[in-house]
Amino acid sequence: MRLALSLILGLVCVFTIPAVNYSQGGQMEASRTVAGGGISVPGWVGKIDTKEEAGGAKLENAKLEKQGDGLHVVTGPAVTYWNPANKATGDYTVKATFKEPKYMNLNNHPHPYGLMIAGNDLGTDQQSYLYCAAYGNGNFIVRGFGPAPFQMNGGRGAPDPAVNKAAGPGEPVTQEIALSVKGDKVECSINNKVVASYDKAALVTAGKLKSTDGIYGIRFAHNTEAIVTGLTITKP
């Protein structure tokens, strides 16, 4: 009887634990639920990470809304947002400006946000895309899904002098991020400096991207807030 009760209590604990993420540096932190969450920008859709879904989180636990000419994002679970009409082919550059109004206001350590390109089969269990994201502490990461997660510059990313640092928690910090496809190269630029460059063949391969052609959008880690402006694509 005692054994059966212990097993039941154990199962209750397993199924009531909130979604948990391991962030940069290995910190463990539960994803929040954002009040008034969901997507209110016409034409836009999104998908939270599979591990967030497995923990019981929903897309409605994060928020995407219009704020002036920009997009206001508050997470919640880690999420990628896109408009299916935003497609890029051939050589192109996608860029946007990300302003974190209050650095680390929803977390106790830095969390990243940035751009996503090369999106294919988005919203399905076979989705693939690449993203470059900045932290307000001067670090950046280049990662993707194919459909399993993959990393291009290590598990903890890398620092670069081009990445702006917030003066401290609660202070604003802004990053201009761009992802470019140029011939056989894919590059990430932050604040007008190329911080990472890869051969296209290293990205368009089994377990990574299906193509560099695809949908572009924005990518946010969990428990993060920023305003995105100037999301544009240019062709050479």
Feature-to-residue mapping (PLM):
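Bacterial N-terminal signal peptides
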Residues: 6-16
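Low-complexity, Ser/Thr/Pro/Gly-rich disordered linker/stalk regions
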Residues: 25-106
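Secretory/extracellular carbohydrate-interaction modules
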Residues: 75-151
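Short, aromatic/His-centered strand-loop micro-motif at the edge of beta-sheets
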Residues: 150-176
